[in-house]
Amino acid sequence: MSLFDHSVSELHTLLKKKEVSISDLVDESYRRIDEVEEKVQAFLTLNEEQARAKAKELDNQLAKGEETNPLFGLPIGIKDNIVTKGLRTTCASKILYNFDPIYDATVMERLNAAGTITIGKLNMDEFAMGSSTENSGFQLTRNPWDLERVPGGSSGGSAAAVAAGEVPFALGSDTGGSIRQPAAFCGVVGLKPTYGRVSRFGLVAFASSLDQIGPITRTVEDNAYVLQAIAGVDPMDSTSANIPVPNYVEALTGDIKGLKIAVPKEYLGEGVDEGVRQSVLAALAVLEKLGAAWEEVSLPHSKYALATYYLLASSEASANLARFDGVRYGYRTDNAKNLIDMYKLTRSEGFGAEVKRRIMLGTFALSSGYYDAYYKKAQKVRTLIKRDFENVFERYDVIIGPTTPTPAFKIGEKTSDPLTMYMNDILTIPVNLAGVPAISVPCGFVDGLPVGLQIIGKHFDESTVYRVAHAFEQATDYHKQKPVL
């Protein structure tokens, strides 16, 4: 049995009782990485020397009885688009292959204050643009459940590392499903918080109105502990919300009697794998036995979500990625004859194909002749999608459906057709457009591959999302299943 089969609260108890040391936990992480990393390839950069030194320092503090934070001394993996002071941050892009940040993201400051130990930085789709982690500029991460399949994306390294037992939990970011989709594919728990619940300061921006940082964990309770540590207003992020952070762990009562669940007919319709559909219906039956009731509803504008998302996200990416020009930091071409040449060649040589595709799409949508026809219209449709969610939440507590239309697909299966790749996020994207919280929890298997159940909540009501997810988790054993590597 691995130490990381224990939950956060169990590991905390073991540390308090001195049955294990923090150094033991760090050793366990690097031992497991040595054992399986060659197969999974989740990490881009390891932080071994600093992690071991910090473990010794925290062990000394623990011996003096100085710390009671539940995350104190626990190892964590960090998606490589979250800046970490003194630890290389690449966004899985060659344009940032040598970028060494001089400051920590706010979430890193909060995790460091809680006493977590950063094991390393995790692979992802370049600049978080992708659904399979095949767009990384450096390496291919594989799904621990089937090494011939993708782990999902863009936080594929984070989900794969947790599923493979390399770390007990990790941070990811979610712009259109990039936490929830890989969590579903890898059979772990992933939460996208409400937009503004977690500071984005120090998250390398893809689409600023959609991005959110969130936890990927083995259990719902672990997820709640991590969100507790990173949530809250931040003066460095004007989009972070000054709304009190409740105690998420206290919300895990197991009681969902009388809860009203909405199930959008659009989320179980055409394109959803039959095995996935049956897994979700079985999960709803479990929730019914626990005292909840569900009804079918409609989110009529969901069918426009994919087009809306790719117009808006690509437009924001076009502006955000303009800063990577070879002038201040990162890659700079050696082949330029003049300044304009340097800009063009640096970006052409430094960015991968998918990033270039989205920059071009966004630049086109924002251009003067097409702004009203595309970007402005997409913003109006986004408002309609938000309104659909608001209308449903007037009558229901949560919305439930599958996280993804299918289980994990094979490596290389969708790379030649961007549209089929984009379709994989069709069930997660509306949540980002609406800015509401959503979690993916394991709810079954299709041909030995995990299936995710998506539970969507009202703005800043992560507590109810967690309560429902935890009740379902405790009534089943899917979260206890582990891949064999």
UniProtKB/Swiss-Prot annotation:
The active site is at K79 (charge relay system), S154 (charge relay system), S178 (acyl-ester intermediate). The keyword Translocase does not apply. One of its GO terms (molecular function) is ATP binding. GO terms for cellular component: glutamyl-tRNA(Gln) amidotransferase complex. It catalyses: L-glutamyl-tRNA(Gln) + L-glutamine + ATP + H2O = L-glutaminyl-tRNA(Gln) + L-glutamate + ADP + phosphate + H(+). Pfam families: Amidase. GO terms for biological process: translation. Keywords: ATP-binding, Ligase, Nucleotide-binding, Protein biosynthesis. Disulfide bonds: none annotated. Its EC number is 6.3.5.7. Allows the formation of correctly charged Gln-tRNA(Gln) through the transamidation of misacylated Glu-tRNA(Gln) in organisms which lack glutaminyl-tRNA synthetase. The reaction takes place in the presence of glutamine and ATP through an activated gamma-phospho-Glu-tRNA(Gln). Belongs to the amidase family. GatA subfamily. HAMAP family: GatA. Heterotrimer of A, B and C subunits. This is Glutamyl-tRNA(Gln) amidotransferase subunit A.
